[in-house]
Curated annotation (Swiss-Prot):
Species, as recorded: Escherichia coli (strain K12)
Gene3D superfamilies listed in its UniProt record: Fimbrial-type adhesion domain (2.60.40.1090)
Summary of the function given for this chain in its UniProt record: Part of the yehABCD fimbrial operon. Could contribute to adhesion to various surfaces in specific environmental niches.
Further remarks about this protein from its record: The operon is cryptic under classical laboratory conditions, but is functional when constitutively expressed.
Gene designation: yehA
Biological process annotations from GO: cell adhesion involved in single-species biofilm formation
Knockout mutant characteristics: Deletion of the operon under classical laboratory conditions does not result in any major effect on E.coli capacity to form biofilms compared with the wild-type strain.
Protein name: Uncharacterized fimbrial-like protein YehA
Lineage of the species this protein comes from: Bacteria, Pseudomonadati, Pseudomonadota, Gammaproteobacteria, Enterobacterales
Record's GO cellular component terms: pilus
Family: Belongs to the fimbrial protein family.
Secretion signal, residue range per the UniProt entry: 1-20
Keywords: Signal
Pfam (any one): Fimbrial
Length: 344
């Protein structure tokens, strides 16, 4: 009886030496630069592969690609959100036999825009570059260990923990008596951003005799003059000069008549001011000191719009306007409005 016990102990000591296993934790990092005109193309794909060499592997082992998860990446304070979809180039298990220690695996990533309300998994903060750990992982762990680790990873994310924390926990769960092989990805995006800068515009009206001014509340029908607001656009996309984002053009001023968002008055209260018109309708200017009444959208350019030229022209007409005949007197008139371009 005593001999059998000793033999059993001896067998337990010897058997693990020949047990097939890999124990290393290896990782590789790749870099993905999202194209500057991504706002136009809306999709980008890249493929990566790597040859892992795990010298700890003995006998025969099976390396299993784990199912990858889509990742939402936030850039520039999460104002840009990208969806990263990962797929293995070969989903089949990899068999290492006869003490083989190296194998090659790869994956593809497809980048598309994410919804504005999508929950961000990995954020670059205020920047445009971020390193994402564990975008794709392989392991020699048993099926039960892999299943348990996958559930643990999902619960970790649902519990609100960070991507890195969940990936580290996931790797640790897989690494129990098994090899773990991970792909990390650094993503960078410096988007081409269309800007349209307005030229200064001076509209000078010809003098008008006081006798030809209309009654209070009317614009003069003579000596009106048209000018063109010119926007000079840069960073257009592709050969068709497409815009990367939506733009709106409007006017604002601090020289508005009290209780009016359409009448510009000079420094002196002499009963006469100016009214601006676009396509035959009065232009509502944003009151710099009181923005509650809104403004007229002089021009809207949608994202991906094709511009025939790098300039945008917006015609506008200026006319005299009498707001109080009792104050009318001769003299120079001058008022200023600002040309604003709003981007979305």
């Amino acid at each position: 009886m005593e001999i059998r016990i000793m033999l059993f102990i001896l067998m337990m000591m010897v058997m693990p030496v020949s047990y097939a296993a890999c124990y290393s934790e290896l990782s590789v990092q790749h870099n993905l630069v999202v194209q500057g005109d991504f706002a136009l193309t809306q999709t980008q794909m890249a493929t990566y592969e790597h040859n892992f060499n795990d010298s700890s592997c003995v006998s025969t082992n099976t390396i299993t690609p784990m199912s990858p998860s889509d990742i939402i990446v936030g850039l520039y304070n999460d104002t840009i959100k990208l969806n990263l979809h990962f797929e293995w180039t070969n989903k089949n298990n990899i068999t290492l036999s006869n003490n083989q220690t190296s194998f090659t695996s790869g994956y593809s990533v497809t980048v598309t825009p994410a919804a504005s309300n999508a929950k961000v998994n990995v954020s670059a903060g205020g920047g445009g570059s971020v390193m994402i750990n564990g975008v794709a992982t392989l392991s020699s762990a048993s099926s039960s260990t892999r299943g348990s680790a996958a559930v643990q990873f999902l619960l970790c994310l649902l519990g609100g923990k960070s991507w890195d924390a969940c990936v580290n926990s996931y790797r640790n769960a897989l690494a129990q008596n098994a090899g773990v092989y991970s792909f990390n990805l650094t993503l960078s995006y410096n988007p081409i951003t269309t800007t349209c800068k307005p030229d200064d515009l001076l509209i000078t009206l010809d003098s008008i005799p006081v006798s030809q001014l209309p009654a209070t509340g009317n614009k003069a029908t003579i000596n009106s003059k048209q000018g063109d607001i010119i926007l000079r656009c840069k960073n257009l996309l592709g050969q068709q000069n497409q815009t990367s984002r939506k733009m709106q053009v409007y006017l604002s001023s601090s020289d508005l008549l009290t209780n009016s968002n359409t009448i510009l008055k000079g420094a002196e209260d002499n009963g006469v001011g100016f009214i601006l018109e676009s396509n035959g309708s009065p232009v509502t200017l944003l009151n710099i000191t009181n923005s509650s009444k809104g403004y007229t959208n002089l021009k809207e350019v949608a994202a991906k719009s094709k511009l025939t030229d790098t300039t945008v022209s917006i015609p506008i007409t200026a006319s005299y306007y009498v707001y109080d005949t009792n104050k009318v007197k001769s003299g120079a008139l001058e008022a200023t409005a600002l040309i604003n371009v709003k981007y979305d």
